[in-house]
Curated annotation (Swiss-Prot):
GO molecular function, one term: unfolded protein binding
UniProt remark on cofactor binding: Binds 2 Zn(2+) ions per monomer.
One record GO biological process: response to heat
Residue windows of the CXXCXGXG motif repeats: 156-163, 173-180, 199-206, 213-220
Zinc finger (CR-type): 143-225
Protein encoded by which gene: dnaJ
Protein name according to UniProt: Chaperone protein DnaJ
Keyword Cytoplasm: yes
Domain comment in the entry: The J domain is necessary and sufficient to stimulate DnaK ATPase activity. Zinc center 1 plays an important role in the autonomous, DnaK-independent chaperone activity of DnaJ. Zinc center 2 is essential for interaction with DnaK and for DnaJ activity.
Length: 369
């Protein structure tokens, strides 16, 4: 028996390239307009129109079902194909099935294999959300609490995540008659076969909503902005991932929330180089300061500065270690601030400077020139 083809796009009044948001808006508008309770004088026609709107939305709101509808013009039972002597035609058909359904063609001919899970549209976990956060070296000293804002899907407050309009209830699935299974009779290369598969329209439950939720369009989720505070532990490494349980998207149809995965990025500080829990700071002094001694100002990662005394006769590339001025390690003990001292030798001298140095060289018996 040949199936009557319906133009679901025409039923919802949307173009064939309509986005999911446009389809959802059209559905919300039409279910309100054609709800049978609003047409008591012509209830039978309204009920038929209402069912068509529901059926069209079920197909066009599901990317997989919509892809099949766009290719073949229907969803559900498959048409009977003419057998030919060349295998090319059937190979193309098999590929179409596998591309669209991600199912082995033999599952279609012989039914689902033992132990194979049924596809259900309920209680699926929500997706994880990945969020990058930038911290400074000062945040790594004692840890930090950083406010973040992001968008996530939350459980629909109108339907409580069921996807069903409140008080609408369920009806038997018209595709499977409430059994949750579809019986198929097919002709193949191997003969005539009878198979059973899970009903794709109801996910094997045998029931479908009488009316989808007007707030979420049947998904059970709505998009919301979320503000929360993320705790950053001391001295985390760049690229560290922190998992916040339940901080991701809401599950489908009452399923659990996914997680928020915070990826920590440590903002480079041009003053320091990080080496584990130690910090390295480079300072350059004049050769006279190295000879005579001096005091230099050294910045601290948490802010402020400390004074470092450079003794007379300090050699180039001398290293000074300021204990406990670095970053905390995993046990809470702070590393060191390592100061590398570079000595700058002037490339040019004034006459007076050269005269003074030459006199000094003679006194010290140093050969020059």
């Amino acid at each position: 028996m040949k199936r009557e083809k319906k133009d679901y796009y025409e039923i919802l009044g949307v173009p064939r390239d309509a986005t999911q948001e446009e389809i959802k808006r059209a559905y919300k508008r039409l279910v309100k307009e054609w709800h049978p309770d609003r047409h008591p004088e012509n209830r039978k026609e309204a009920e038929q129109r209402f069912k068509e709107i529901q059926e069209a939305y079920e197909v066009l709101s599901d990317p997989q079902k919509r892809a099949m509808y766009d290719r073949f013009g229907y969803v559900g039972e498959q048409p009977t194909y003419q057998e030919t002597e060349s295998g090319g035609f059937f190979e193309d058909i098999f590929k179409e099935f596998e591309n669209i359904f991600n199912r082995d063609i033999f599952d279609v001919f012989f039914g689902e294999r033992p132990g194979q899970e049924e596809k259900r549209e309920y209680a699926r976990r929500g997706e994880d959300i990945r969020y990058e956060i930038e911290v400074t070296l000062s945040d790594l000293i004692n840890g930090a609490e950083i406010p973040v804002e992001y968008e996530r899907y939350e459980t629909c407050p109108r339907c409580g995540g069921t996807g069903v309009e409140p008080n609408a209830g369920y009806i038997n699935c018209p595709s499977c008659g409430g059994t949750g299974r579809i019986r198929e009779e097919r002709r193949s290369f191997f003969g005539y076969f009878v198979s059973e598969r899970t009903c794709e329209r109801c996910g094997g439950t045998g029931k479908i909503p009488r009316e989808y939720c007007h707030e979420c369009g049947g998904s059970g989720r709505v998009l919301r902005k979320v503000r929360r505070t993320v705790k950053i532990p001391p001295n985390v490494e760049d690229g560290t991932q922190l998992r916040i349980t339940g901080g991701g998207n809401a599950g489908y149809y009452g399923g659990p929330y996914g997680d928020l995965i915070v990826i920590v990025r440590v903002k480079p500080d041009p003053r320091f180089k990080k080496s584990g829990s130690d910090l390295v700071y480079d300072v350059t002094i004049d050769y006279l300061q190295a000879i005579l001694g001096t005091t230099v100002e050294v910045p601290l990662p948490e802010g402020g500065t400390t004074m470092l005394k450079i003794p007379p006769g300090t050699q180039p590339e001398t290293v000074f270690r300021l204990k406990g001025k670095g970053l905390p390690n995993r046990y809470g003990r702070r590393g060191d601030l390592i100061v590398n001292v570079h000595v700058e030798i002037p490339k040019t001298l004034s006459r007076e400077e050269r005269k003074v140095l030459e006199d000094l060289a003679k006194k010290r018996g140093v050969t020059i020139g």
